[in-house]
């Protein structure tokens, strides 16, 4: 399609450049999703170049397309860990969409809310929490107005925006605000599940899991348990329908439940959930090691810590060393990403052997950690 449209543009640019820009944008999205970053970048920028020319001729017609192209480029550079470029394009999209909203709020407020939310996520990940808060709240303000007019269309995104704000405030130690937004998200998803369980149960389970983590961290174990088990109940049902899609999520829930029950000094339940998580991650690693080995290593470490506290050093040692072997493999592929995990694994092993009175092994692992 691109080659055909390029030939048509050579004959009549005014007529066919919009179609060519659209094709470039679609190709950028495709190659982005396929992980072919060089091609994705080329097509995203080609689309932007055309839309910028078109905007000079007819801003009313093409500014929405240019804003979308800027937003796509921002997401691309965000994924490529190029924050300066990501910020540039995210803000360029926002600037256009704010102008469009002044002209036609009904048509363009949904896009502006999405851009604000994207910027919030970006700044949140960059540790710029004040900016993240501003954009999250701007997105929520718009989305609430939209949901009042058309709940079916806009409540799902509003719930997602609430979750983002909840996570931000939780990280900031603003527990009252965090709780409010987490519960607001749950309230919406529970309503949506009543209408369409297949579509929204995964999101409700995630919200329950978020609430469980929140209440665990804030010393409210009864509420934490309630939400952890609610998330597990949904995810177990989802796994029965589609194991490939939902096993990673139930493994995460099992791991969280293991951590919770270990902290509550309920070792039988903790062990049950730790081992259930490991069993799933081991299966997932056989299918896709790149995606799940890190999660498996984390679960092995959790089990090691658990068995050490339970006075079962043989099992603890096994899981510590299993985790270490995974981190060694990961370091071979990507030292920058995984050397901190391997160093942490060495330190854990050093402490373990020190407590077991095996000073030579303890020293070996301490020195290995220092070397990293």
Residue ranges and their predicted role:
Residues 1-18, 23, 33, 347, ...:
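Low-complexity/repetitive intrinsically disordered segments
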Residues 7-18, 53-63, 98-109, 145-155, ...:
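Flexible helix-coil transition and linker loops at the boundaries of alpha-helical arrays
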Residues 18-33, 48, 64-78, 94, ...:
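Conserved alpha-helical positions within TPR/SEL1-like repeat arrays
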């Amino acid at each position: 399609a691109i080659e055909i449209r390029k030939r048509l543009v050579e004959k009549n640019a005014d007529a066919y450049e919009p179609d060519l820009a659209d094709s470039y944008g679609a190709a950028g999205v495709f190659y982005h999703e396929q992980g072919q970053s060089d091609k994705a970048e080329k097509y995203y920028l080609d689309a932007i170049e055309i839309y910028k020319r078109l905007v000079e001729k007819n801003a009313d017609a093409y500014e929405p397309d240019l804003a979308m192209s800027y937003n796509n480029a921002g997401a691309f550079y965000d994924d490529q860990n190029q924050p300066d470029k990501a910020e540039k394009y995210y803000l360029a999209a926002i600037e256009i969409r704010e102008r469009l909203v002044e002209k036609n709020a009904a048509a363009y407020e949904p896009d502006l809310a999405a851009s604000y939310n994207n910027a919030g996520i970006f700044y949140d990940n960059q540790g710029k929490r004040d900016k993240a808060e501003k954009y999250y709240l701007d997105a929520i303000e718009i989305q609430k107005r939209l949901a009042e007019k058309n709940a079916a269309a806009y409540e799902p995104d509003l719930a997602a925006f609430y979750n983002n704000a909840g996570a931000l405030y939780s990280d900031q130690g603003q527990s009252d605000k965090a709780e409010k937004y987490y519960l607001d998200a749950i309230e919406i998803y529970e309503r949506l599940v009543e209408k369409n369980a297949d579509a929204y149960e995964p999101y409700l389970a995630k919200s329950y899991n978020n609430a469980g983590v929140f209440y665990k961290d804030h010393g409210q174990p009864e509420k934490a348990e309630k939400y952890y088990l609610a998330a597990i109940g949904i995810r177990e049902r989802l796994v029965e329908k589609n194991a490939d899609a939902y096993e990673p999520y139930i493994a995460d829930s099992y791991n969280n439940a293991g951590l919770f029950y270990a902290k509550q000094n309920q070792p039988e339940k903790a062990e049950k959930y730790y081992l259930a998580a490991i069993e799933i991650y081991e299966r997932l690693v056989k299918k896709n090691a790149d995606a799940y080995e890190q999660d498996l290593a984390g679960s092995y470490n959790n089990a090691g810590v658990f068995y050490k506290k339970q006075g079962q050093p043989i099992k603890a040692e096994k899981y510590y060393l299993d985790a270490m072997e995974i981190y060694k493999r990961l370091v071979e592929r990507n030292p920058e990403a995984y050397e901190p995990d391997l160093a942490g694994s060495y330190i854990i092993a050093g402490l373990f052997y020190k407590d077991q009175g095996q000073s030579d092994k303890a020293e070996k692992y301490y020195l290995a950690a220092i070397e990293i």
